[in-house]
Regions:
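Structural/interface elements that position substrates and couple domains in central-metabolism enzymes
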Residues: 1-400
């Protein structure tokens, strides 16, 4: 079988690599020439444990080839971004563009699957688009939706071991899609209709957002009452039916920080809890900014000179290089606006460089700093000493 994967980003590339290593012939398509060139050279543009070796194997065996345009295949998969606009409305234009790019290549019996996160009803909408452009293919294609279920940092394991939800426009489509995924997914495959599969993805991430909001709200309460939030959570979690998450400086990533808006935009009257969770998590980022600014001001008043501040972490979660929707980026951007000549040192051990911020080795920035701000609990940070001669702002539980 030959499959064409449209989009070689944080989901498309790992999926293509895993499928290729299971013997499926994969043509990976991306409009970014640099990604295509890098992939064909066997070098991953994504930091992910184990991915580089598997990519090298896939390219060497010629099971994975990257191109800038799609080609004819037995199956087509859509892995493109679905961002939200400034009005917090989902933008499916990339999904539509990717779909239009494969419409001329479709043949009877082909499988078409969307993995991108989409509003409820999008798969049916794309099916209508395909059939408008190619009416002769009506009822001759297998069309399905299968949301990705993996987390950066553990992508390879979750790609193969997590259960998957597969929604078809009919039972035959769901079955055909499940047949394909069974070649590289060892988890159980659950078939349903497209709308249920679409909303399932949105519900999963909205639920996580609500959970995180609870933890973040607790951290603010504890700060105002002189209670250590990590101690509180550890004790509360001793209850067999309680599992409070670790608070952070907000919520990032292209899923949890974004997907709730897909439900909110479609069901504004029915999503009051989800909307409030979004407000809490957004506010937590601003709360952290206020705390950092206050610490800088307090230091200046006490010591009569400006502090050196180490900002530790830019990624949206520990031990990855993914900066999408990262609250740490927003925090650093605000702190960098301070016009008092405070020296700000930024460290992100998973990046070699950043297009805006000058990055400094985390050991050096920690050593020089008067104030250390932990925004991301990267594993290397946990080896740094919990000293008393510096102001430590641990927003993510590095020292928990």
């Amino acid at each position: 079988m030959k499959a064409c994967f449209i989009g070689l980003g944080y989901i498309g590339l790992p999926t293509a690599i895993v499928a290729a290593n299971r013997g499926i012939e994969i043509v990976g398509v991306d409009i970014n020439p640099s990604i295509v060139k890098q992939t064909n050279s066997g070098k991953s543009h994504i930091v992910e444990a184990g991915l580089q070796d598997l990519l090298h194997n896939a390219v060497r065996s010629q099971k994975l080839i990257a191109r800038e345009v799609p080609v004819k295949a037995d199956a087509f998969f859509i892995f493109v971004p679905t961002p939200i606009n400034t009005q917090k409305m989902p933008d499916i234009s990339f999904v539509e563009a990717a779909t239009r790019s494969v419409i001329p290549l479709l043949e009877p019996g082909n499988l078409y699957v969307i993995e991108s996160t989409v509003p409820v009803g999008t798969t049916e909408q794309m099916a209508d688009l395909i059939y408008r452009e190619r009416p002769e293919l009506r009822d001759k294609l297998y069309i399905a939706y299968c949301p990705e279920r993996m987390i950066p940092g553990n992508a390879l394991y979750e790609l193969t071991h997590n259960d998957r939800v597969i929604g078809g426009i009919n039972e035959a489509s769901a079955a055909r899609a499940a047949q394909f995924y069974s070649k590289f997914v060892d988890g159980e495959l659950h078939t349903t209709n497209t709308r249920t599969a679409e909303i399932c993805k949105l519900v999963e991430n909205s639920f996580r957002d609500v959970q995180i909001a609870f933890a973040n709200e607790l951290s603010i309460i504890c700060q105002n009452t002189g209670i250590d939030v990590n101690t509180l959570i550890n004790l509360a979690n001793l209850h067999p039916r309680v599992n409070i998450l670790t608070p952070g400086c907000g919520v990032g990533g292209h899923c949890i920080a974004v997907d709730p808006y897909f439900l909110i935009s479609q069901f504004p009257e029915e999503t009051t809890l989800i909307q409030q969770a979004r407000k809490v998590n957004t506010y937590k980022t601003q709360w952290c900014i206020t705390k950092i600014k206050k610490s800088i001001k307090d230091f200046e008043l006490k010591y009569k000179h400006r502090p050196k501040v180490a900002i530790m972490g830019l990624a949206f979660k520990p031990d990855i290089d993914d900066l999408r929707e990262s609250p740490a980026i927003d925090i650093v951007g605000e702190i960098m606006k301070l016009s008092n000549n405070t020296e700000i040192m930024i460290s992100e051990p998973n990046l070699i460089q950043h297009q805006i911020f000058n990055l400094i080795d985390y050991n050096e920035s920690f050593r020089k700093a008067d104030i250390v701000v932990f925004l991301v609990a990267h594993t290397p940070f946990k080896n740094l000493p919990n000293v008393t001669d510096k102001v430590i702002l641990d927003f993510c539980g590095v020292y928990k």
